[in-house]
């Protein structure tokens, strides 16, 4: 009797795991389908940062630009300027306040920078996240326990119009980005080329080197 019960429980667990994996695969496929419907766009964004207790601690504005495949640019204008650029192979982060540039490969950065997924169809990128869907909201959770990120939410309708996205970090702090003034087409590939500004320190995490231009 105990053996039969154990086998039944094991079978139920396997079915549950298979069902969850199937649901996850469906959610990934649907999110990718929606993202692929719009190949390029430009939008303004409003950012709201909240503490783990839900208190607003900062707000900001900037511009978000995408060109598939694998190119995106997030240019934060306020309250403090910074720039994130994916050129398809590398992810660049520039902080003009401290005059520092950090660069990593897209492959290594995707675990902590899920924005990469908004322009990527690379299976190795998507395999780093569990994905679930609730209507027009998709919830992505990194599989790696080493990730600084707890959750990434994407709000996108069936026509492929991205409404916004949000991140929740391990410490509970959240960042909400709401897109507005969205326009499609006319996004120059030159926007996704990055050169280290003169005088800026370069932290090259692709090889662990630091240098100054």
From Swiss-Prot:
Entry keywords, A to Z: Chaperone, Periplasm, Protein transport, Signal, Transport
Location, primary (coarse class): periplasm
Domain of life: Bacteria
A GO biological-process term: lipoprotein localization to outer membrane
Signal peptide: 1-23
One of the record's GO cellular component terms: outer membrane-bounded periplasmic space
This protein's record includes keyword Chaperone: yes
UniProt xrefs under Gene3D superfamilies: Lipoprotein localisation LolA/LolB/LppX
Localization, UniProt: Periplasm
Keyword Amino-acid biosynthesis: no
Functional summary from the UniProt entry: Participates in the translocation of lipoproteins from the inner membrane to the outer membrane. Only forms a complex with a lipoprotein if the residue after the N-terminal Cys is not an aspartate (The Asp acts as a targeting signal to indicate that the lipoprotein should stay in the inner membrane).
PANTHER family: OUTER-MEMBRANE LIPOPROTEIN CARRIER PROTEIN
Family label: Belongs to the LolA family.
Name recorded for this polypeptide: Outer-membrane lipoprotein carrier protein
Gene that this sequence comes from: lolA
